[in-house]
């Protein structure tokens, strides 16, 4: 079995089209479900410009951050390319893995 590494991945959001991101979220979550169950997607969530000041306030989403367990950078990039957010143009693949 190949050696697996934990990759910290930051993906900036397309600030010009956050409505499409919100509408695509159900497909994004469904896509991630088997990755979570397999232990490939260790954790993830939105990154924010600021924390909400009050309950119910809209989140100022500027991207996502996640930990992906994989054997290579190319595997991580492929997982990101297959995500509905990436297919929508909501993330920058070139900037995704650091």
Swiss-Prot record:
Pfam families: YCII. Pathway: Secondary metabolite biosynthesis. Disruption phenotype: Does not lead to any phenotypic changes. Induction: Deletion of the conserved eukaryotic csnE deneddylase subunit of the COP9 signalosome leading to defect in protein degradation results in the activation of the silenced dba gene cluster. Expression is positively regulated by the dba cluster specific transcription factor dbaA. Expression is also controlled by the transcription factor flbB. Belongs to the YciI family. Part of the gene cluster that mediates the biosynthesis of the antibiotic 2,4-dihydroxy-3-methyl-6-(2-oxopropyl)benzaldehyde (DHMBA) and its derivatives. The direct non-reducing polyketide synthase dbaI product is 2,4-dihydroxy-3-methyl-6-(2-oxopropyl)benzaldehyde (DHMBA), produced by condensation of one acetyl-CoA starter unit with 4 malonyl-CoA units and one methylation step. The FAD-dependent monooxygenase dbaH is responsible for the synthesis of yellow pigments derived from the oxidation of DHMBA. The roles of dbaB, C, E and F have still to be determined. This is Derivative of benzaldehyde biosynthesis cluster protein C. It comes from Emericella nidulans (strain FGSC A4 / ATCC 38163 / CBS 112.46 / NRRL 194 / M139).
